[in-house]
Amino acid sequence: MIDTHTHLYSEEFDNDRAAVIARAKAAGVTHCFIPAIDSIYTDRMFALKNDYPDYVFLMNGLHPCNVKENYKEELAHVENLMPTHHFCAIGEIGIDLYWDKTFLKEQQEAFAWQIQLAKKHKLPIVIHCREAFEEVFEVLESEKGDDLFGIFHCFTGTEEQAHRAIGYGLHLGIGGVVTFKNGKLDQFLKNIDLQHLVLETDSPYLAPVPYRRKRNESAYIVQVMQKLSDIYALPESEIERITNVNATKIFQL
């Protein structure tokens, strides 16, 4: 299995990171893809890569929740990092209006700029969207093309929004929310071809049932796979195979 989205550098793993990674490997997780947040976490990400060079793969980008007054400095940091490392994607990037709409204009500008950066380097994007589907789609519409591809991380939208995202060349990142009773994804996901899905945890956040409200970790991706096996009425091995192929293509492994 491939965990396409995990914050393994998070402080929440500082006391037992090696054990968390050992459990992930024991569960069958072969690759962990690591989204960027902002410049504060850069050193932690590179330290993680140094410790697990063949297991973790780093993205570069500015998280929409961290688009503040200094966002242009942060974007310059992102650009300056590009020659220093082989990044697997630009992410996580997007728009988040859940807590605050103060910086919507700046979030839109940062999102579009980072999409263009990804295109320049022929990299996928990994999108963060919260309470902002229309705003995200507006930017994607302006940037659409054959060179736009990637993952709509932690997809929690409707079936119609799923098809719109796929229409822009994106795969849907499916994580713990699919196991929630109120998650609603299970009501329509079987209408979406598996070739458009990848697995993720977003750990340490959004742990799947039966670990909900506890710290999430990559090993719990098994519960996501099991839920998809139920939804699609396919063996877990087939869910794993197809989503692995999808992730491998996106990240050009």
Regions found by a protein language model. Give the residues of each.
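Mid-domain alpha/beta scaffold segments of enzyme catalytic cores
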Residues: 1-253
